[in-house]
Regions:
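Conserved alpha/beta-hydrolase catalytic His-Asp/Glu region
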Residues: 122, 137-186
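Short beta-strand/loop motif that positions the catalytic acidic residue
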Residues: 199, 205-207
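Conserved HGGG/HGGXW glycine-rich cap/lid loop of the alpha/beta-hydrolase fold
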Residues: 6-59
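Conserved alpha/beta-hydrolase "acid-adjacent" motif
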Residues: 212-218
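Flexible "cap/lid" loop of the alpha/beta hydrolase fold
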Residues: 97-137
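Gly/Ala-rich beta-loop-alpha elbow adjacent to hydrolase catalytic centers
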Residues: 88-96
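Active-site loop/oxyanion-hole signature of alpha/beta-hydrolase fold enzymes
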Residues: 49-87
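Catalytic active-site module of serine/aspartate enzymes centered on a nucleophile-bearing elbow/loop
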Residues: 228-258
Length: 258
């Protein structure tokens, strides 16, 4: 598998497809480059998936997990493979925001799925420390089981979601993710949201109602900030999952400029 060096960090990269457009995919907190792997073969061109520092198969420095650090990882991978499009999920969307805040013309097309942060710190970041504590205190498999137990009610309503979450946790680097959690939840994606008004690239925003970590209201705020944006808002997690085929097609057409 290809790797990209970014300072003292080695970033794991996986490639799907070939040709244009070249799109870099930035995953969410605790996940890896495999997060969107089931969907990238359906997209045209080249999909460049990578693991952020501390995640998946990339190296895990002792510190340096703020959004500007993650944006640096994103930029290094995008430049290495000539990516002019970017797709980001949650934390990955925050890394895109951080990067275009400094370089508004960095990407030609941008997709943000379930954005989670802007220029206001998370409320009660200590609530995430419990996950970091578990990852640092128990063997990986036991830590994952204990973390999944905290979502017992959610899994009772939709048991299949547990298997999905378990799959997403499998490539996790426990110590690296714990370090990332402690830093990134105390940071902001961008110093001033008004900087996003300078971004002229088309932006596709995908959000859902009822998600406290990825509030739909943030999607509406971003829709107002970006000069050329589309907003898709789903009513629930169930509707989001059911809409995946439609969303994949929507993203495919958007990235191709159709």
């Amino acid at each position: 598998m290809p790797e990209v060096r970014n300072g003292d960090v080695t970033l794991h990269v996986e490639i799907d497809g070939d040709g244009d457009p070249v799109t870099v995919f930035a995953h969410g907190l605790t996940n890896s480059c495999r997060e969107l792997a089931p969907f990238t073969p359906s997209l045209a061109g080249t999909a460049v998936r990578f693991c952020f520092r501390g995640h998946g198969h990339s190296s895990a420095p002792d510190q340096g997990y703020r959004f500007e650090d993650l944006a640096s990882d994103l930029d290094a991978v995008a430049r290495a493979f000539g990516a002019r499009n970017a797709v980001g999920t949650s934390m990955g969307a925050g890394a895109i925001m951080s990067l275009v805040g400094h370089d508004p013309a960095r990407f030609d097309r941008i997709v943000m799925l379930l954005p989670a942060s802007l220029d206001v710190p998370f409320r009660n970041p200590e609530r995430f420390d419990g996950i970091a504590d578990l990852l640092e205190s128990y063997p990986k498999d036991e830590a994952i089981e204990r973390i999944l137990e905290t979502s017992h009610e959610r899994y009772e309503a939709a048991p299949w979601l547990r298997e999905l979450d378990l799959l997403l946790w499998q490539d996790m680097n426990p110590l690296g993710v714990a370090r990332a959690i402690r830093e990134v939840v105390r940071d902001v994606s961008i110093s001033d949201r008004e900087l996003l008004r300078k971004v002229e690239a088309p932006v596709l925003l995908i959000c859902r109602e009822g998600d406290t970590l990825h509030p739909a209201e943030l999607g509406r705020i971003l829709h107002d900030l970006f000069a050329n944006s589309e907003l898709v808002t789903l009513a629930s997690e169930e509707e989001l999952i059911a809409s995946i085929p439609m969303l994949v097609e929507r993203v495919r057409a958007f990235l191709e400029g159709a």
